[in-house]
Amino acid sequence: MANWTQLGLQDASSPLMEELIYFHDYTLIILTLITILVFYGLASLLFSSNTNRFFLEGQGLETVWTIIPAVILIFIALPSLQLLYLMDEVNNPYLTIKAIGHQWYWSYEYADYRELEFDSYMIPTSDLTSGNPRLLEVDNRLTLPAQTPIRVLVSSADVLHSWAIPSLGIKMDAVPGRLNQVNFFISRCGLFYGQCSEICGANHSFMPIVIESVNFSTFETWVSNFITE
């Protein structure tokens, strides 16, 4: 979850988010160097008296400023393509969840277990207990095992929604009449917060997502208790 005065991205809680942060930092370094070079060129042009006013063409210079940007784009595109393929990779998920967006709450179905489904509503500010984040806590958290390949099928029962967990590097649109798939691997136990990231009506800001990641034995106990209840 993001904290006050936090300027960077949230701490990565999945291998995919780690790769996204590496790519962000790598691209930022390249953009910083380009910005410094451009400002240096502008400063040299403005404050130098050695400008040749009759300089009409320069084949060598034109070749350089064509090749160098092309090389820079290649160095940005290759890691980006690798990430795109990594996002779509399916590694035999152990658990499949179906997340359905509604106005304005989420419902979850555990496809591998019978009668394991529930709705998840935001807890109003007046009902929050001490320590719970405002507009982010829900009455029923999505409980998932850590260190386990997971697949989530995302859809919608009414309008467009988007199921997004920033610390896991996940954002998948929920489209009525269509199933979209997202795969992830949670690296550690903890609470991970997200929100609907597609404007879906008056209460768009009030349909948060909370994943509670636990170890596998705790998850099996939770499943057994939920079904018996």
Swiss-Prot record:
An example Gene Ontology molecular-function term: copper ion binding
Record keywords: Copper, Electron transport, Magnesium, Membrane, Metal-binding, Mitochondrion, Mitochondrion inner membrane, Respiratory chain, Translocase, Transmembrane, Transmembrane helix, Transport
Top-level enzyme category: translocase
Membrane side Mitochondrial intermembrane: residue ranges: 1-26, 83-229
Annotated residues for binding of Cu cation A1: H161, C196, C200, M207
Catalysis: reaction(s): 4 Fe(II)-[cytochrome c] + O2 + 8 H(+)(in) = 4 Fe(III)-[cytochrome c] + 2 H2O + 4 H(+)(out)
EC number of this enzyme: 7.1.1.9
GO CC field: mitochondrial inner membrane
Protein's GO biological process: ATP synthesis coupled electron transport
Ranges that cross the membrane: 27-48, 63-82
The protein's required cofactors: Cu cation
Membrane topology: Multi-pass membrane protein
Binding site for Mg(2+): E198
Main location: mitochondrion
PROSITE patterns: COX2, COX2_CUA, COX2_TM
Source taxon at top rank: Eukaryota
Note describing how the cofactor binds: Binds a dinuclear copper A center per subunit.
Mitochondrial matrix side: 49-62
Subcellular location(s) per record: Mitochondrion inner membrane
Residues the entry annotates as binding Cu cation A2: C196, E198, C200, H204
InterPro entries per UniProt: CcO_II (IPR045187), CcO_II-like_C (IPR002429), CcO_II_C (IPR034210), Copper_CuA (IPR001505), Cupredoxin (IPR008972), Cyt_c_oxidase_su2 (IPR014222), Cyt_c_oxidase_su2_TM_dom (IPR011759), Cyt_c_oxidase_su2_TM_sf (IPR036257)
Protein task: Component of the cytochrome c oxidase, the last enzyme in the mitochondrial electron transport chain which drives oxidative phosphorylation. The respiratory chain contains 3 multisubunit complexes succinate dehydrogenase (complex II, CII), ubiquinol-cytochrome c oxidoreductase (cytochrome b-c1 complex, complex III, CIII) and cytochrome c oxidase (complex IV, CIV), that cooperate to transfer electrons derived from NADH and succinate to molecular oxygen, creating an electrochemical gradient over the inner membrane that drives transmembrane transport and the ATP synthase.
Assembly notes: Component of the cytochrome c oxidase (complex IV, CIV), a multisubunit enzyme composed of a catalytic core of 3 subunits and several supernumerary subunits. The complex exists as a monomer or a dimer and forms supercomplexes (SCs) in the inner mitochondrial membrane with ubiquinol-cytochrome c oxidoreductase (cytochrome b-c1 complex, complex III, CIII).
Family from the record: Belongs to the cytochrome c oxidase subunit 2 family.
Identification of the protein by name: Cytochrome c oxidase subunit 2
Organism of this sequence: Patiria pectinifera (Starfish)
